[in-house]
Structures are given as structure tokens and as C-alpha cells.
Amino acid sequence: STAPLTPDGHINLSPKGLDCFKVLSSNRVAYMDLISSGNETSAHTLENGRITFMFCSFDEKPMILRLYGKGHTVLSSDKEWRELARPFKIYPSTRQIIVADISKVQSSCGFGVPKYEFSGDRDIHFEWAESKGAEGLEQYVEVNNLYSIDGLPSKIASVR
């Protein structure tokens, strides 16, 4: 989750799936971010860096784990990209990598989290991206990913 600094700004919760999260060191993590309908995480971390990751156990042993830190966006044009992209499978719809330096870790019981069984990843994003093609994806980013819903620029907007 991320949030802008203004008290009336919108808090962003962005659930993730796929094999997109990596632990880079004892206090650094990253996730590969795909093109989607907004770009709140990039805009918020560009403004203030604050980011929280939450993981929930949905099997027999309940637990919630939160990672608190300062994050930033890395684009394919950035010097960091080559090394950071190495552990990820990069897709045509990969938009950026969000990197966070973790300053605090917290766990809680998770007793209120229901049990669920994983049945598989969704293919719809990749089908959508393929139907758009490279040019269509670029146009989609231009229309939907330059600014947050509160009007904050994402890193993509800051380099255009």
C-alpha cells in the first residue's frame, strides 16, 4: 500500500499475484509491476517514498506479515534496471520495477483471515496485453499511467 501526503488523497492497495516479488537482500525487496489501469504506487513513492507490503497466509497456519519501507520506481531506461530485472521474467507488459528498502517488519496472528485454496494464476492480463500489441500498450500507458487519481505524476510522467 502507498498513499499521498495530502490528507484527502486516496490510499492505494494493490494486490499482486504471479511470480513478481523478490527478496534482494536482508532489507531490500522488489516487485515487477505490469501495465494496469493506474500507476498509484509509482506516483506515491515518487512523492514520499512510503510503501507497505502485506502478505497473508490462507492455509492452515494463520499469519499476516507486513514490510514497511521506502520505495522507488525503476524504469527500463534507468541504470539500475539491468541488474534488478535479472531475477524476474520480463513480459511485454512489464511497466516498471518497484524497489523498497525495508525499515520495519511486523507479524500478527491472522486469526481473522479466511482459509482459501489457490487454484491458479489468471491469464487475462497477458491475453489483454497481447491483443493491444506494443504500440497499443504504449498508448494505454500514455492515457492511464502518467498520473495518479489524485493528479500526482508517476515516474513515467516525470521522464516524458
Spell out what each predicted region is:
Residues 1-160:
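Binding-site signature for planar aromatic cofactors or substrates
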